[in-house]
């Protein structure tokens, strides 16, 4: 089976498991259950694979590996060494009685208890600080799973049985990670506006990541940072565009705990080593992070919540992230606060890509002062206008702003990619061809009529530091000149058609007859009234 067929089969199987929960709760709610159980199976299957490897036994099936694990765990001479090896290798241990395979076996035997699954979750969370509170969003006793303990048990049992046939550990790395991303994308589509908190469409992620990684594909030890990471999809795209993916260090921050947990699972399912990712569950603007080395990064990738309210407390004027600008982003729109936070954590030779609404390009007052400061120091390298309606949480057009610290000039390159899309059922989509066109234009940095323009700093000053894309890229299409004689002919033809329609309508009205004297009188009065109009 080809990798494409394998991925397609895996995607479909995972989505079928979601059908069991779909009728009982919103996608935004059931994603935690399904993704959490997939992750638990992944950890559990890895244990059984590792048991076979460390006991020099060929892995044949999870049932065979389960029996091997039970036998050796029961042997007191082997147990402690086996636990130590598993902890060293995987960073956690799941006892034989609590593996996914064992619990599914108990489901078929009619002895399964939700408490066994809850205990397994607790054991995993306590095994390693990176697993702490990982499953806290999964309430196994929630009423939405069923009104009685028996119904709750049955719902979870059905999902586990559906997932049981999947060899998720066999798909570890990008195949399983991509399947997980597929599910997250499907949840985002189902969730609508609620999805914006955790997902950036893949096309946008690919475009931003390729820009940040341009010329760095072979760099070892690359560090990437996303202070509003959501599910981590934007960060994880770094793996696709690096020839040294195993050496990348990932840093991310997320305020919403359920989304933070999603990102942690996503990292592991993509095969990222525990020591290579560093994630924080805090408020990015209120609590600067990281504050200990390393604090700056080769690449910064961001898709923050748009025009979010924040405190804008005057104390932030002393915060090193914002102090050199003399003003703060307005309380009603934190867009520039997020941008300055990311820029502060960018290395001198790094590249930053951030998605924001178009308002940041032209709004006045404090935002204009911040924008002017950034332009005067040459920080804004490129502005890319994206198509409208490509995000799940908003239909407004957005822009990617590329920032750098080591530029020797202050010009700004503008790309109007607002028409680079194909229409989808609910959203517009950017294809690989659209992305390739934008990337090629970005790299060449040359003027293209109605698509791209390299604006000098003097030109920007003349525009009062307003970066609104239409000021620099003229996409106006003139209407073709139509001779007046042609217009007269068209009007005459239209008048003729109107006359024909009115004649047909008058004929149809003349055929109307009332079924009673009263109805006939009313109809006659109606027709007389029409003649007066």
Task: Tell where the protein language model's regions lie, with residue ranges.
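Non-catalytic, mostly N-terminal accessory regions of nucleic-acid modification and defense proteins
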Residues: 1-212, 278-284, 385-388, 410-418, ...
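A conserved structural/catalytic subdomain of Rossmann-like adenosyl-cofactor enzymes
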Residues: 3-5, 287, 292-533
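A generic secondary-structure signal for well-formed alpha-helical elements
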Residues: 41-51, 187, 216, 242, ...
